[in-house]
Amino acid sequence: MDAVAVYHGKISRETGEKLLLATGLDGSYLLRDSESVPGVYCLCVLYHGYIYTYRVSQTETGSWSAETAPGVHKRYFRKIKNLISAFQKPDQGIVIPLQYPVEKKSSARSTQGTTGIREDPDVCLKAP
């Protein structure tokens, strides 16, 4: 999971929400560890000023799935990156397609990116 750029590890729900709200962009998303269910992850998505959280888990056979809207057929993916790619498309059972990955930065240095926007020292937002 550490190889997934949007995975922030064991951050609190509040910290994840602050990171997403700081972007101000609907469709911004990140992955973090669930605080309440060990071994489960949370896919957090910003939409109209609210954070929507979807549980993501890995089956015993290694497949990945997300709990989406009721009535939406549960899909399984071989890799977490495939799950993220699928949810970048509309009508997948989440509030808005995943559009702007909020990546965890490896260095704590603030830089002037190629977009000319100063980046937060802990995250990097990439436009598609």
From Swiss-Prot:
InterPro entries: SH2, SH2_dom_sf, SH2_prot_1A, SH2D1A_SH2. Changing A22P: In XLP1; uncertain significance. GO terms for cellular component: cytoplasm; cytosol. Keywords: Acetylation, Adaptive immunity, Cytoplasm, Disease variant, Immunity, Innate immunity, SH2 domain. Changing Y7C: In XLP1; reduced protein stability and reduced affinity for SLAMF1, decreases interaction with FYN. Residues 106-128 are annotated as: Disordered. Its main location: cytoplasm. GO terms for molecular function: protein-macromolecule adaptor activity. Residues 67-92 are annotated as: Interaction with FYN SH3 domain. One of its GO terms (biological process) is cell-cell signaling. SUPFAM superfamilies: SH2 domain. Residues 6-104 form the SH2 domain. The modification N6-acetyllysine is found at K89. Changing Q99P: In XLP1; reduced protein stability and strongly reduced affinity for SLAMF1, disrupts interaction with FYN. Residues 117-128 have a biased composition (Basic and acidic residues). Changing S57P: In one XLP1 patient; uncertain significance. Changing R32Q: Strongly reduced affinity for SLAMF1. Cytoplasmic adapter regulating receptors of the signaling lymphocytic activation molecule (SLAM) family such as SLAMF1, CD244, LY9, CD84, SLAMF6 and SLAMF7. In SLAM signaling seems to cooperate with SH2D1B/EAT-2. Initially it has been proposed that association with SLAMF1 prevents SLAMF1 binding to inhibitory effectors including INPP5D/SHIP1 and PTPN11/SHP-2. However, by simultaneous interactions, recruits FYN which subsequently phosphorylates and activates SLAMF1. Positively regulates CD244/2B4- and CD84-mediated natural killer (NK) cell functions. Interacts with NTRK1, NTRK2 and NTRK3. Interacts with CD84, CD244, LY9, SLAMF1 and FYN. It is linked to Lymphoproliferative syndrome, X-linked, 1: A rare immunodeficiency characterized by extreme susceptibility to infection with Epstein-Barr virus (EBV). Symptoms include severe or fatal mononucleosis, acquired hypogammaglobulinemia, pancytopenia and malignant lymphoma. This is SH2 domain-containing protein 1A. It comes from Homo sapiens (Human). The gene is SH2D1A.
